[in-house]
């Protein structure tokens, strides 16, 4: 069994540059913990003193620049608390940000790109540029890691999956070009589709929201583990295999339903809970509420 804690003084800095140790930036995290808000305000004034008065052309984002910054800083902190070596994958092109999507409840937009670039220029973030088919990677640089180390902010005060929609509709797999067919063994990605609610989607969302609320009130653990993760072998490209870590922290409790090929009649399976990835050997060790 593991206990939530802070990285030790000796282990609070990044020591590995493995960009495969990463996860996507989570745009559905939030917290109003006072000490964290103080850090947000301090860094905002330091690095973006005139941002709120800047007038930009084009339609205005529903989320302020400061909300973008706070969400980014919060997920960087959660990532660092999980593993100081871990990176976050981020879109650095405007097309990767859909502010009005139902799958982006905080309405974050391509404003995030400018904020990331400024923090990289100020050596607040480490940055690894993405290659074809991969996202760019960021993580807290040493000066930000030092601030995180001194921040007494328990992850239990973070709201995960904030306003996140648990009902997802995906389209058909994108058609590969000839080169992709020859060089890649990855499954083709299905695009996420926008949709209009129906009485049935509203009903399904209500059921899942209640289920996820129940999960958030419970403590889920694997008593035989000394660290908050387990590893499973996952095939990557060609014959190469890699152990992939699945964390059993609160950010991996959210359960969603995914429908396929643009139809509510196809798919509908449940995904998201870390317990769905656990081995049969560890399954008997799952513990609820100690």
Predicted segments with their positions:
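Long, low-complexity, charged/polar intrinsically disordered regions in eukaryotic proteins
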Residues: 2-65
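Extended repeat-based interaction scaffolds and adjacent low-complexity, acidic/S/T/P-biased segments
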Residues: 5, 72-73, 88-90, 118-119
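Helical catalytic core of nucleic-acid polymerases
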Residues: 27, 44-45, 49-60, 64-67, ...
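Charge-rich, solvent-exposed alpha-helical interaction surfaces
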Residues: 39, 115, 207-210
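Pre-recognition alpha-helix immediately N-terminal to the DNA-recognition helix
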Residues: 70-75, 114
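Generic recognition of stable, solvent-exposed alpha-helical segments in well-folded globular domains
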Residues: 110-114, 203-206
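A short, conserved structural fragment
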Residues: 116-133
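Acidic, glycine-rich two-metal-ion catalytic cores of nucleic acid-processing enzymes
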Residues: 128, 135-290
């Amino acid at each position: 069994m593991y206990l939530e804690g802070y990285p030790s003084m000796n282990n609070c800095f990044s020591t590995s540059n493995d960009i495969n140790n990463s996860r996507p930036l989570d745009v559905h995290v939030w917290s109003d913990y006072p000490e964290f808000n103080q850090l947000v305000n301090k860094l905002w004034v330091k690095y973006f003193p005139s941002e709120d008065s800047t007038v930009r052309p084009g339609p205005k984002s529903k989320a302020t620049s400061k909300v973008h910054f706070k969400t980014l800083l919060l997920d960087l902190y959660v990532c660092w608390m999980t593993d100081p070596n871990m990176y976050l994958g981020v879109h650095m092109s405007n097309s990767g940000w859909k502010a009005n999507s139902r799958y982006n409840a905080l309405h974050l937009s391509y404003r995030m790109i400018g904020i990331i670039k400024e923090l990289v220029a100020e050596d607040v973030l480490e940055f690894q540029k993405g290659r074809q088919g991969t996202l760019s990677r960021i993580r807290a640089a040493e000066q930000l890691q030092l601030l995180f180390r001194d921040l007494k902010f328990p992850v239990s005060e973070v709201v995960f999956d904030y306003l996140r929609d648990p009902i997802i509709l995906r389209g058909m797999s994108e058609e590969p070009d000839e080169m992709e067919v020859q060089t890649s063994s990855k499954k083709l990605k299905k695009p996420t589709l926008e949709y209009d609610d129906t009485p049935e989607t509203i009903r399904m969302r209500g059921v899942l929201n209640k289920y996820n609320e129940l999960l958030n009130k419970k403590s889920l653990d694997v008593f035989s583990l000394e660290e908050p993760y387990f590893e499973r072998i996952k095939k990557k490209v060609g014959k190469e295999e890699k152990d992939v870590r699945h964390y059993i922290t609160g950010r991996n409790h959210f359960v969603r339903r995914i429908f396929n090929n643009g139809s509510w009649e196809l798919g509908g399976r449940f995904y998201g809970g870390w317990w769905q990835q656990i081995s049969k050997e560890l399954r008997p060790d799952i513990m609820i509420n100690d």
